[in-house]
Amino acid sequence: FDLSKRSWIKCGGVIKTFIKPRSVKEINYVLLYLNQKNINYYIIGNISNTIIRDGEINTPFINLNSLSKIKKLNNKNGLHIYSDSGVSIPVFSKYVINQGYSGTQGLYGIPGSIGGGIFMNASSFKNYLTQNIRKIIVIDSNQKMKIVRKKEANFSWRNSIFQSHKSIILGAYFYFPI
């Protein structure tokens, strides 16, 4: 898998093992195998804010872009939605706007994914992806699914708890008030 042809900034080497699971169940199978074999791995999404070295790369990469559903939960007192981590931020932003809500218009130009945006607390024009987040669904370092509440995520400028704790962000619940 040639990263220089897929990354946002058109650089990076050739990944020998590129894994693109289509479901949480498949992610768990992949993690079980890699952990049993004591193989390190990288999680990637849109490869838009990541610089990866040139040359051949032996470490497996797990791409979560196939987790790409947005689900409207209800409209009671505002818009409640769930987004998978592989949804692109522009698609997410447009979805919220098309539902008649604001708060994401400044995010439209960010080329990343929801998972990466949560990981780094992405923002643009004073719109933070995480400002309307309620909870995040992750697979923790023990391979258990876990809910992380917004307060627990310790969001700050370009930072979150996920940068210091090995978790895989699967998706998040958002609320946009009327």
What are these regions (language model features)?
Residues 2-114:
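Anion-binding (especially nucleotide phosphate/pyrophosphate-binding) glycine-rich loop
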Residues 12, 19-24, 51-69, 119-149, ...:
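Structural signature of FAD isoalloxazine-binding scaffolds in flavoprotein oxidoreductases
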Residues 102, 132, 153:
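Short beta-strand or tight-loop elements
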Residues 1-2, 88, 128, 149:
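Short, solvent-exposed coil/turn linker segments
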Residues 152-161:
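Flexible, small-/acidic-enriched active-site or ligand-binding loops
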Residues 176-178:
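Oxyanion-binding "anion nests"
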Residues 77-83, 99, 118-120, 141-145, ...:
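Low-complexity, flexible helical/coil segments
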Residues 32, 172-174:
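Hydrophobic transmembrane signal anchors and adjacent membrane-proximal interface regions, especially
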